């Protein structure tokens, strides 16, 4: 099932598709908060986020906020309507992230927001289905069904795209750290600290060692440039 690039590019350009992603992401966040309960965001996280956004020229004028939910595990993801969702496990005793590592985690999510990766993933699903009459949630359900049917290699293809996105977000996140005056190597330290099984490692996220190698290579390229 090849990706239809015409459908993909059209989807990315359409404001109606953006509204579909916005509605879908808002519902997902609401469902998450309803399931776990909302948690207060530590002031440190808000101040670090403000520093990162202020330093990033690609986010100028955008209002981005943090939302937290009550869960002991660690997870973070972005929503297309300018929200970064973080589990309270991010500041639990088992995690103990330094400020620059907090910045690294948030910078990774900001990189996803820059690229509109939430919409990009949805438009990829539509482009694989090839039926532009479908809504984006319907296209996602269709590709999910196809991925688990065992009738195609779509699951491997989508996983490869997702893994490439994560590596790109790591590299761009390190650049955002540098722009904000943080050590870009905090990205690799954050990844290493969060390396225990089940954290940022799955079919949608590359192995931690591969991500660390990639981000260090990107930092070195920038550091060695004239």
Regions found by a protein language model. Give the residues of each.
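A Zn2+-metalloprotease active-site environment signal
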Residues: 1-226
